[in-house]
Amino acid sequence: ESSLPKKVLIAKPFYYSYPPMIKYSGMETVYLKTEEGQIDLDDLRKKIIDCRAIIINSPSNPTGRVESINTLKEIESLANQYGVFVISDEVYKDLIYIQKNYSIAGPHVITINSFSKTYGMCGLRVGYLWSLDNTLIKDIIQMKTHTSMNTNILGQAMAMKATKTPRSFIREQLKVWQDRRNLLYNGLKKIDPDLWNPEGAFYMLPKIEKSAEFVWDMYRKYDVISYMGAWFGAPGRVRFSYALDKKKIEEGLFRINEYLNSRHL
């Protein structure tokens, strides 16, 4: 049993399930400052010494930002120094456009990954993790066994097939994702000139006035689905996904502009 406080560090904006999962684990969430969606290292150094674990999500859902390799190495070093667990959520790691992948490693690191994003298997919910801590892995297997039980057979079969997919296929898909990103980014930048350009994953998080009203109006009146940034710890922003073909992205941008223009009539 760790003697460290029952606190878990996450960066804002965050994936919206992190705070509830931390709460249901009997822990307290501590929030890290970010600069343009990337971790503030000075704030990290101050707060990590008072936490039991830190969750890293790079590339990020909801921002698409990627932490620099230097930042990831600093987290790796600090975690090792203070005995803090690192939960590295790397489900978008194959969807990085701007640098080589770097995976945090060490005795206190738990790496989480998924077949959902890389192979387009989102609905099948097949994931995996690894760690050097065998005791921890055994505890996780017990928890999995007595909560969600077995992973569906179809998903397992597809996952095994996916492991035989050439890496060249994954690299080729990056061009498709970049084209979609560029299309959405150029459209949304007209709404938010300071919009962060995603370096990975497939999300954007622009500032939009009356964001809650925007999300519900777009859904009810224009059949466009987006998520409120407030759900991710980013009030005043809206999360969009570009996991769509380019024609749908173009149509979505047209409807967004149509709605925003109607606001000013």
For the regions a language model picked out, list residue spans one by one:
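Substrate-binding/gating loop at the entrance of the active-site cleft, primarily
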Residues: E1, I10-M27
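A short helix->loop->beta-strand "cap" motif at the edges of active sites that frequently abuts
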Residues: K6, M27, Q81-F85, P107
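Helix C-cap/helix->beta junction micro-motif
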Residues: S25, Q81-Y82, I191, Y222, ...
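Active-site phosphate-binding strand-loop segment of PLP-dependent enzymes
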Residues: E36-Y97
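PLP-dependent enzyme catalytic core of the Aspartate aminotransferase-like
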Residues: D42-R45, K210, D217-S226, F232-L265
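Conserved glycine-rich beta-strand-loop-beta hairpin in the small C-terminal domain of fold type I
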Residues: M160, V176-Y185, L195-I208, G236
